[in-house]
Amino acid sequence: MYAVMFAMYRKDGLSPEEFVAHYRDTHIPLTRRFAGLRQYDVFPVEGGEGPDAFAVMAFDSADDFQAIVDTEDFKEAMADSETFVERTDSYVVGHIPIVAGASAIRA
């Protein structure tokens, strides 16, 4: 698995609620068209300083991720990002599964 984590900061003038609504209603539908995207999770941050949301996109390989970067779908999603995201920090991350489900938690 190849995963990229994004820390996103909303544009000045957007409330946290407006940021999340745009992300959910406009941006996520654009990213659903990415071929090779295996998983996409978004974590809005509740209150406080720092990023307004984290997102993790997972692919089978770095090549699969790179392949979408050159597509019109990706360019459209990036253009949309510029309308509501001031800054994005990105990181290639590993994955250490901890809990597979509620049944995995036992004393």
For each feature predicted by the language model, list its residue ranges:
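Macromolecular interaction modules
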Residues: 1-107
